Amino acid sequence: MAVEEKNSPTGAAMTNTGILVPSSQQSLPEWWTKTQKFFSRENTITPTFGYFRLLFGTQPGKTDIALIVIGTIAGIGAGIPFPLLGILFGELVDDLNSSTCSTTQAPPGGYQAAITTKVLQVIYVSILNFVCMYIHTGCWSMVGERLVRRLRTKYFHSLLRQEIAFTDTLPSGDVTSRLVSDIEVIQAGTSEKVGLFIGTISYFVAAYIVAFLKVATIAAMLMSVVPIYFLMAFGGGHYIKKYSGRISTHINAATSIVSSSLSHMSIVHAFNANARLEALFAQHLVSARMDALKKAITHSIQFGMLYFVAYASNALAFWQGSRMIADLAEGKPSKVSVGAVYTVIFVLLDASFVLSQMAPFMHIFASAASAGDRLMTTIKRQSAIDGTSSEGDSTISLASEEIELQDVTFNYPARPEVPVLQGVSFKIPPNKHTAIVGTSGSGKSTVVALLERLYDPITGCVRVGNRDLKEINVRHLRGSIGLVQQEPNLLDRSILENIAHGLVSSSQEKHKHLLPTLLGPSLSELTEKIRQGASEDEAVTEQGDVVREIVNLTRHAATLSNAIDFINALPDGLATRVGSSGAELSGGQKQRIALARALIRDPPVLLLDEATAALDSTSERLIQAALNKVSENVTTVSIAHRLATAKDADNIIVMQKGRVMEQGTHMDLVARDGVYAGMVRLQNIGKFSSSSSIMTESTQVDANIDRSLTTDTLLNKEEKLSLEQGVLDEKEKPAQLYMPEEADSLPTEPENEKEKPKQTLWATMKGSFPLIRPNILLISLGLITSIMIGVSYTGEAVIFGHTVGSLSVCRGGPSIRSSGMLFGLLFFILAIVKFAAVIVNGAAFGWAAEKTLYRTRVLSLRSLLRQPLEWHNADGRTPGLLVALVTSDASALSSLTGTTIGVLFSTVANLFAGVILSQCHRMEDSRSPSGYLTRIKHQKAYAKATAITVESVDNIKSIAAFSLEQEAYSVFNRSLKAPYKSNMKSVLHGNFWLSLAYSISTLVYALAYWWGSQQILAGMYTQVQFFIVLPALLFSTQSCGQMFALVPDISKARIAASNIVDLLSIKHEGDEEYDKTGSKASAKHTDPRFNMLEDKPRDVEAQLITTTPSSFPTKGMGVQFRNVHFRYPSRPNQPALDDLSINISPGQFCALVGPSGSGKSTTFALLEKFYNPASGSIIIDGVDITKQSGAAFRDTIALVPQENVMFEGTVAFNIGLGARPDVEATQEEIEEACRLANIHDTIAALPDGYNTVCSQDGKQFSGGQRQRLSIARALVRKPRLLLLDESTSALDVESEKHVQDALAKVARKTTIVAIAHRLNTIHRADRIFMIERGRCVDQGTHAELVERCESYRANVIHQSLDA
């Protein structure tokens, strides 16, 4: 249960890192602190220490201490009653034995009274057992829930404070795996199962105590096998932990592939890359599968040995007990009785049985310890640059301070062999504009990262005034800087919250009072109310004056960044959610929001890394004018490839290959005729116009006008420009084109899923059967051995009954000895049989489970990758939830072919065998009710918190740059409250039924004893019959309790199976034809959805050879848009294309230009058939693709997206993804494409060359390098139609020149359509289409449009460098 503390409104205290942590950790007893320190040590000698470190090394609070203590005491108490029952049952045996051996004809009434009294005592003890069990399962369930919540917060806290270098080297998919798989494993291993295990150990110890008190000789003999139990537990745990670590590594990589693929579905579709991604995914799964099999076999051997030792020790006990009873029967001196021997054998037999039933728990605990160690490694890691720390000088002001880099060298940790900066030295004067230009990969963005102290130099230093940057408090430093990144990352919040993030760590004193509101839920609640229909003014008034001040500051910043008009045009205005990383906005919109976020804090230092690269020239010009106005007393550092945006800088620094080549003003550098002058010549668009002198004159006039404009006048001018008004209809969302709409919003259940009726159990089973069918022989073997295991309990009962019956003193000593030896031998044989059965069972089900898991995951990913974008764009259907289908749901389903189904079948076999045995011996008490099972609801809790964590890590540079660690932490904690509260409530009623299920066996046993004893006393049944049925019923009811504990897993698997069957049941275009993700059906009746890759999938990274290299086509494609209308499904009231008509002839180089949001990228989306138009025709090579099924036409189309995407895999694999589906690109073809894209030399210089592994999104490469890799991926396809969406926006002029020359060669036999804001890249186009408001308003050559199109001419003038 949650305990609110008084230290803060959230029940937390502030640490020296500035992050809120639970205040219950304060003022703990000294002994508890010492315990924590002991278990916090990195002692990994045994899994036991790892497990205790998990429990006690995470700073549990007072409530946790109380729950652990109470739960442990109750667990110990729950284990004691049954050995006490053994004493009572032993006395009952003596009473029954005396009765049956008596010569009196009628049963004495005293025996009946004694038996009734003891049965009542049994019932009382059973009630006590239930109470103790309910308490300990409840306490430990809450301990587990609180522990995983604590681990989540600590892990997230640790991730937030780590330096960027750490996250750069973090394995792809690692965070998702930690927060989904590992947390789930930890919760399973630290909840009610701990209480059950403690109760079992208590039972085991108490049983031996009772045994020693009753018959010390037998107890001492059996005590010798106890070390073997622990040896098996710890030895097996060691190997299980070893294999779990290996599995985790492979699964992390596989999960990364799934995540990146589902996040960039348009790229997957554009290149038909699903088969190659699926194959790479399968490779990782195969590697994990072998380790999983070893883990399963290890577990089964561990389990089997525990059974063998338990049964073998019971065989010894039977034999020794029979000898003692024989001595007693022969009148030899003996202090034992039949009841005493029975008590010893009974309690030790049952204790061994229960302990063996706990063997699966050892596997769970070992896995939890292993998962805990993985989390604790990150949690305890000390950050080299802690943005949350209070250390360092927080008083220094960056205003009017000179910034200097002194002989700085640097290389990124992910690629330590590659130098990025080499002896860089330059000064940045205060209150001046310094521009940094140069080739892509020259270190420009790295300089910005060092100024923000996202990294520290390897040698040299960065100084502010006379202070080293390391001496300044990191949070204070970053709070004094406004940053606009090359690829702006926004968090999945509203526009208001994203812009207001700039105020969170502002160094301005006037913003300090806003911090509590910024960290609280007020802005989130405000935007939610607006989205629900409330007016902005009313909602703001309700929230108070501070919120109104934040809203006003936000609007002012949005005005300065030229974003206010498109914001006002959105249905929810400032309350509009931007999606994960701003996926709901276009590239230009995101840049303007990011600029507003930087400007809102009124920073003394402004860092602009390609801040206007995604904007059209008019928008860029307006923003530049606004920046000139607000940066008069600001130190501004800008990085630019468009030299027009840098020419007015006070100082321009030119960099190449990590060195400063030259610096000075624009005029000085042009006069030197050096590197910069060459860049100017390459980029100057003025020379391409016949009206160059006119443009130069116009540029000078406009420059003078711009300097005289106030911000208000500027915005009035903007409203009159038809170009910028096109932004009001900004629906094309270029970022969204390559990322499904609402792609990474926080996981919620899709509306259509909520309304869809659930599948029946039969439909689910029928749909799941094709997944299981290939493993039917393994499953059959597992089921046979499960039945053998289940029936073995009945065999045990038969042997036990005959043994107890044969130990009656009514029989002679020799008979007792021979019977004891016989049944002891039978018990030993049973031990051997069960040992073999358990091993075969574990191996068979383990291998079947892994093969089913492999098949299910690959088929699920296949189905997901084949769904159209509109399916992925459905409301609430997010990559986060879809990844769960491939990972969590597939894993849950596979449990039905693994240990869960094995235990279930052995339990059912045990139950039926016990009932049948009871009926064979005509015991009426077997018809007594044994209780009912209750289904536990399966919950997908914490998905939102996981999504927040993954999003924060993906955007960690933005989080760090704006010191949003505390804000992200606050949002994260708020997301935990609802599922935490819900789960804690479920503990109360869920554990009631669990405790009842485990305790019911004792009551059934008491009832059976009472009824059976009456039958024996009445002379209707024999002792042998009674003692056969009694343990059979006991084992059956105990197995029912264990089966009840499996109900959550079975329920989980049932839901998972339903989800997966639903997914696989979706029909796709071409199911009846060749399945490109697999192979042709082997028979006509075979469902192609279940076609599988080979058991050993092809190595897609190694298989880069083909017998016949492909060649460039001889003819390009013709393209026509005829009266096309289109609206995005998410915004049906706003047109994206409005009667668009264009005609592109085969082999032409055509360009689409126009303002941001005018519909340019939407044309590409329709050309790729990501969507179908509402009306009109799209004709490619004479075929209307809107009326054709399938997308085979994409095989000869290549796309270079605006936002460049890399997948998990080598560089060669990423480029090879672009090859046509039926061709594997050769190494020569890959290198040729890279040379054309001017990236070959960069790749060749890497230590691993083309085998260099790209992390998810290729974050170890610069923006320009990723763009060239994307171009190479498109060129390796050798397309007939090449689509370029701002394909050179991140390139320097030299790289751009190389790429343009390469495209000129390709263009001879290929149709090229380019979207561009840099007009110098398309001035040679055969035809340029001017797109505004979803229509083509003009078309012609560059020269023709300069002459007659005013808006086009204005853009040319702005980009000219002749002035």
From Swiss-Prot:
Induction: Expression is induced upon exposure the allylamine terbinafine and the azole itraconazole. It is found in: Cell membrane. The chain crosses the membrane at residues 65-85, 119-139, 193-213, 215-235, 301-321, 336-356, 781-801, 820-840, 896-916, 992-1012, 1016-1036. Pfam families: ABC_membrane (PF00664), ABC_tran (PF00005). ATP binds at residues 438-445, 1154-1161. Glycans are attached at residues 97, 552, 633, 973. One of its GO terms (molecular function) is ABC-type oligopeptide transporter activity. Residues 738-758 are annotated as: Disordered. Belongs to the ABC transporter superfamily. ABCB family. Multidrug resistance exporter (TC 3.A.1.201) subfamily. Pleiotropic ABC efflux transporter that may be involved in the modulation susceptibility to a wide range of unrelated cytotoxic compounds. This is ABC multidrug transporter MDR2. It comes from Trichophyton tonsurans (strain CBS 112818).
